[in-house]
Amino acid sequence: MRKRISAIIMTLFMVLVSCNSGGVAEDPKTVYLTSIANLGKGFLDVFVTFGDMVTGAFGIKADTKKSDIGKYFTDIESTMTSVKKKLQDEVAKNGNYPKVKTAVDEFVAILGKIEKGAKEASKGATGDVIIGNTVKNGDAVPGEATSVNSLVKGIKEIVGVVLKEGKADADATKDDSKKDIGKLFTATTDANRADNAAAQAAAASIGAVTGADILQAIVQSKENPVANSTDGIEKATDAAEIAVAPAKDNKKEIKDGAKKDAVIAAGIALRAMAKNGTFSIKNNEDAAVTTINSAAASAVNKILSTLIIAIRNTVDSGLKTINEALATVKQEDKSVEATNTAEATTSGQQAKN
């Protein structure tokens, strides 16, 4: 995409040079070519600006803080805001060609949804603790409902315009291996909390699915998830309800409705990102703490890296559409309003002289 836009800019530049080689005053055709070249350069600058956001997208680690995830979504929001403004400014400054303006307006609407979703999701990832925040010999703590809901709503908004791939019910590991994962969400005696085998089962579920699967499982979650105050994790039916499930004595199994790898991975990711969310591990199970914190980071990493790639692809596609519109613009396509404004400006300058 960047090469294609650069090629158009270079071609237009060469035409401009040939038009001005005689040193004559600018004619309408030259003004037109200049404005188109400026548009192309402006759109290339937008592409470069967006590319800056990709750096560090794959850097989520076990010691990454919840607030760092919130900042990541805030960065997506601010980048979309910047890209929207640059696109609109370039069209306004360089001719208001209706064909290009229509393509830009449609693209800006998509960017607006990404911006809105990122802003909402950023509200959910808060807290100056690491994303897994696993505790030994203590009860698991559910993700704050408001926090989880913001993450679900925001991610839904973004996924709705950037991602079609993924299976919300993706499932590859055996059911028997998943029966103990619910111990990560319990309140009970230490003997019944999760050990490293349970943590490894959770890691296996996360490893068995793609980032797109996890995102689609979040999309399929209910907004305003129900937290069952009696049966806790055993009444969870989707990823959001896994994330907010309260810890209850001896309630330690994820049931059939939610016992899918993609749903489990999404529930762990949401709980890991959300305010207050923790997992419960047996005392003296240091290996299990490392395992689940790393697994939670992996789930979050899959979500964010898949999102950024999907957003990048959407931006590439949008710029391609604008580029195609730019290539078809003719001198006479300039809007009447822009032409009149230019003529009025020229007349005013001549009057002053």
From Swiss-Prot:
Biased composition (Polar residues): 337-353
GO CC annotation terms, alphabetical: cell outer membrane
Lipidation positions, renumbered (S-diacylglycerol cysteine): C19
Region (Disordered): 332-353
Signal sequence extent: 1-18
Pfam families: Lipoprotein_2
Main location (coarse class): membrane
Annotated SUPFAM superfamilies: Variable surface antigen VlsE
Covalent lipidation (N-palmitoyl cysteine), chain numbering: C19
Membrane as UniProt keyword: yes
Keywords in alphabetical order: Cell outer membrane, Lipoprotein, Membrane, Palmitate, Plasmid, Signal
Membrane topology annotation: Lipid-anchor
UniProt subcellular location: Cell outer membrane
Note: Genes for both Vlp and Vsp families are on (usually) unnamed linear plasmids in B.hermsii HS1.
Family affiliation: Belongs to the variable large protein (Vlp) family. Delta subfamily.
Protein task: The Vlp and Vsp proteins are antigenically distinct proteins, only one vlp or vsp gene is transcriptionally active at any one time. Switching between these genes is a mechanism of host immune response evasion.
Protein name: Variable large protein 17
Gene name per UniProt: vlp17
